[in-house]
């Protein structure tokens, strides 16, 4: 919808960014994933968000399945918040720095909070396997906010019974030396970098010809801004206060 597209252009303007293109998270992820996986290997890339998780199963350039699971890391963060008496930011920092999770749901409450998420991912994998018995999933890549939780790769490996690694290095992607990759870890940048490769191209009607790569429902999607200097996407973070204000405006628009 026009008002939704406009809200993201407004977001970019308020953040002092030049909006080059808009994309949705599914397409953006796919564009980068295709450059990171083996041509003959079937790979599932799991983007762990706070409220939902996006699954992409690919083989070479072919997208075999894409699904969104309505669970994210919020349930885990909430358990740590309650247990430690801290805010959400501190809880996530603890999850990233301390080994709070194990490989067994029954070991502790924090690990158990992953149960619904991983079980739902398992159901998607079972569905995929029933439709593609000749193309079994051979490995899993973890990306997104939750990928840096310490020990999460081991948990997913054991529970999903498939080789799992964190997508914290990107092949053939060169970052500007001024970017601190300890702060702007590649797991946070998969979608903005992918959007620069081949975005859908949602445009404002009054900003020129409105074009998209394909027709169809825009549906509820998470749009992202691809800026001109997309290689330095992580540097364009703005102040917390301004971000909160802009986010609230977008929520009201949507």
Task: List the model feature ranges, each with a label.
Residues 1-242:
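Hydrophobic/aromatic-enriched cytosolic interaction surfaces used to assemble or bind macromolecules
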Residues 211, 252-253:
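Positively charged, low-complexity intrinsically disordered regions
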Residues 241-252:
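Ser/Thr/Pro/Gly-rich low-complexity linker/stalk segments immediately outside membranes or between
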């Amino acid at each position: 919808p026009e008002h939704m597209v406009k809200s993201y252009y407004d977001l970019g303007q308020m953040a002092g960014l030049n909006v080059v293109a808009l994309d949705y998270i599914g397409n953006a992820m796919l564009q980068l994933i295709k450059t990171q996986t083996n041509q003959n290997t079937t790979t599932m890339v799991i983007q762990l968000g706070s409220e939902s998780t996006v699954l992409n199963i690919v083989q070479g350039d072919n997208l075999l399945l894409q699904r969104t699971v309505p669970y994210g890391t919020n349930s885990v963060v909430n358990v740590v918040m309650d247990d430690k008496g801290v805010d959400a930011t501190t809880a996530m920092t603890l999850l990233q720095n301390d080994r709070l999770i194990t490989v067994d749901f029954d070991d502790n409450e924090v690990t158990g909070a992953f149960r619904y998420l991983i079980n739902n991912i398992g159901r998607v994998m079972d569905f995929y396997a029933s439709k593609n018995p000749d193309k079994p999933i051979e490995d899993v890549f973890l990306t997104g906010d939750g990928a840096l939780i310490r020990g999460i790769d081991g948990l997913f490996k054991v529970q999903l019974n498939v080789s799992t690694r964190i997508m914290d290095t990107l092949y053939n992607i060169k970052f500007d030396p001024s970017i601190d990759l300890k702060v702007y870890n590649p797991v946070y940048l998969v979608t903005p970098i992918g959007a620069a490769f081949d975005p859908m191209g949602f445009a404002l009607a009054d900003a020129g010809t409105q074009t998209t790569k394909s027709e169809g429902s825009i549906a509820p999607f998470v749009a992202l801004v691809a800026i001109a200097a997309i290689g330095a996407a992580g540097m364009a973070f703005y102040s917390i206060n301004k971000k909160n204000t802009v986010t609230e405006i977008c929520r009201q628009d949507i």
